[in-house]
Every structure is written in structure tokens, then in C-alpha cells.
Amino acid sequence: MMSKLGVLLTICLLLFPLTVLPMDGDQPADLPALRTQDIATDQSPWFDPVKRCCSRYCWKCIPCCPY
């Protein structure tokens, strides 16, 4: 019984760090990659030129201002 519990504990400890680490698909896109997609944020009505970020509707305008 103890050996089965030890095997189960070892498997859980080996799998846990793999699920905690962010995968490549979870990483946010960097700004140079966004600039190559021809996104005109300066012409967006939600772009704040003083803060150099978008104040609202960040799914339409990039980069988003922190709240």
C-alpha cells in the first residue's frame, strides 16, 4: 500500500510543475510582433497620446493602459 502511495505521490509531484509553467501559447504577444501586423493605434479614437496607450476597448486598440 505504501509503495502505491509513493508512486502516486511521485507522479503527482512530477506532473504538477508541468501544469504550473505557462506554455508558449499562453504568452502575450510582444509589441514588435504587433507592429508588423499594421495596426494603426495612433488613429484609434480610444488611443491616449499622452499615456501612449488605449484607455478603453482594448480588444480594438493595442496597447492597453493599466488600470
Curated annotation (Swiss-Prot):
Expressed by the venom duct. It comes from the Eukaryota. It comes from Conus tessulatus (Tessellate cone). Residues 1-22 form the signal peptide. Disulfide bonds join C53-C65, C54-C61, C58-C64. Residues 23-50 form a propeptide. Its main location: secreted. The lineage of its organism: Eukaryota, Metazoa, Spiralia, Lophotrochozoa, Mollusca. Pfam families: Conotoxin. This is Conotoxin TsMMSK-011. Belongs to the conotoxin M superfamily. It is found in: Secreted. The modification 4-hydroxyproline is found at P63. GO terms for molecular function: ion channel inhibitor activity; toxin activity. One of its GO terms (cellular component) is extracellular region. Keywords: Cleavage on pair of basic residues, Disulfide bond, Hydroxylation, Neurotoxin, Secreted, Signal, Toxin. The cysteine framework is III (CC-C-C-CC). Classified in the M-2 branch, since 2 residues stand between the fourth and the fifth cysteine residues.
